[in-house]
Structure formats: C-alpha cells, structure tokens
Amino acid sequence: MIRKLLDGLYTASGVAAGLCLIVILFLIVIQMLARWTGEVFPGAPDYAGYAMAAASFLAFANALNKGSHIRVSILLNALGERARFFMEVWCFGIGTAVAWYMTYYIWVMRGYAIRFNDVSQGQDATPMHIAQAPILIGSVILAIALTDNLITLLVTGKHRIVRDVTDTQAE
C-alpha cells in the first residue's frame, strides 16, 4: 500500500516536471508571438524561470529512482559486496541528511517570503512564496525518496534505484 503510494508520488512528480517543461514551451511561443505582433507579455521570462526551477526540483525524485542521476558506479563496482553496501549506506545517509536540510531551509526561506510579502523584481511583481512552492514540494519529495531508498537498503540490503538497460553502457 505505502509502496504503491510512494511510487505514484515519484511518478506524479516526474509528470508535473514534464508539464512544467511544456509550460516553458508555451511561454516562449507566446512571447515570440507577442513580439511579432508588437505586443508585450510582461513577466514571461520570469515565469519561464519559475517553471524551470519547478521542473528541476519536481524531477529529482523520479530521476533518482530511474537511475538518471550521476552515480559513482565505477567505484561501487570495484568494491566487494560488503564494502559496497556500507558505501551505499553512507551515500544515501549523507544524501538524505542534505536533502532534509535543504528542505528545511527552503521552508524557512518561503516563510520569510510570506512574512515580508516578498515579490519578484520583474514587471509582474509575483509573490515569491508562490514561485517557491514547487521548489519546496520537489525538495520534500526528493528527501522522501532518499529516505525511502536508505530505509529499503538497510532493511533489504538493496536500494530501489533501477536503471533502464537501454540507458546503460557496456562495462
């Protein structure tokens, strides 16, 4: 039950990241059309930047579980089974701690943006806490994914990162 929920969360996060990329495409096309017709679309570059940050953070957890992140597989493959296990525990432990630390400070930063009514410096004056919300959501999902992999590794001895065979190179 929880496994299906977590896998669904990671997949939904990846889909949301893809939708953010589509939003960027539409923003660029609309901005081009506006320029050709002599109109102005204020804030379009800012919105594209917010969508790019959202796409990046929302994609992290999905990319982690698909094996798309750069890993130190050359080193891990050279180690024995026991040393590899401890190295993976160490890496997931550090990654989990850093992800939760980052999440906490994004939460604090967003709290300050709300408290001080922080707005963007562009023409549109977008409230920054709105632009920071997808970044916070993505960092929470990444921290959950790293915690999930760490706990799975400690309990079963194997992490849940599955790399697609077509994406790997011959070793």
Task: Go through the PLM ranges and name each one.
Residues 1-171:
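Alpha-helical transmembrane segments and membrane-interface helix-loop junctions
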